[in-house]
Amino acid sequence: MAKEWVAVAYEEDFFVGQIEKKLANKVRVTFLEQKKDIFFSWPKRKDRADIKPAFIFCRNLEVLQEKDNYIVKHLTELRQKFEGFSSKYFSQNN
């Protein structure tokens, strides 16, 4: 069974990864590292976190593999979705 590609929001930016495991109230996600433009790869040291599903702002991403690189399709639209999510959930009321 293929692992689901997701985009996870943090306050400053978002990260693309795969859901590895579903836990009680969280999911374990292993993240890619952005190299240049639309190109990503697995970091030398595994980057994983247990996160609340509420921080997944986009599911079933289209990610293509080319040798050791991964290409995240529609990255511009994904960034726009993140900016909308971020302004709604992370912006501080002054």
Regions of interest found by a model, annotated:
Residues 1:
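Extended catalytic cores and adjacent scaffolds of nucleotide/polyanion-binding enzymes
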